[in-house]
Amino acid sequence: MGLDWTAPNAIEHICQPSAPTGGKCTGPDFVNNVDLKPADVLTDIGNCKLAAVSWVIPSGTNSDHAAKLVNIGGPAWVASIVNAVGNNPVCPNGEVYWNNTAILVTWDDWGGWYDHEPPTVLPQPQGDYQYGFRVPFVFVSAYTPAAYVDNQRHDFGSVLRFIEHNFGITEGALAFADARAATDLTSFYNPNLLPRPFLTISAPKGAQYFINDTTPLTDPDDD
């Protein structure tokens, strides 16, 4: 059996590789907007330089893939980012990150070999895309009611739809996935509520651990 891994093809237009096989990414969007040190997001938060939209992927060591019998890196990594946002002081421009930041946590795998809930079969045309097993998703914000559970069918395209909704972009305008997404995640929060006070998450490792960690970076599996 061979391995057909086409994920890099999806960002080829952003990477603009310097060689047909291998090479470095030379595209301006990649060079200017892709930071290959995951912990830099923590210093960006602390320095009040967090980008309006940030896609944060941990190193392989701090991902939730089952490489070890006990893996505390992944949960601690997520907690460090949420805590950094929630505990960040008022920025010089008056911005309070906890009051205007939504943190969307999801995984690329479902964590097992079975799901008792069969995936919905989408009507054509869908190209080669259909739903698979469910994956976890957590929506963190000051305007999400505590312990809220949403039972609608969401998908990865819903994340794009949320960004479009939040920044006034025509919903469904970015790609195939968001155009066919069932939701835009707005059911997870109510902007008319007063922001809930942040409660620090207890974790065995904090932001300074990840910022100061000199362990060689490894790629997260499949990313």
Give names to the regions the model predicted.
Residues 1-223:
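N-terminal pro-sequences and low-complexity stem/linker regions of secreted or lumenal proteins
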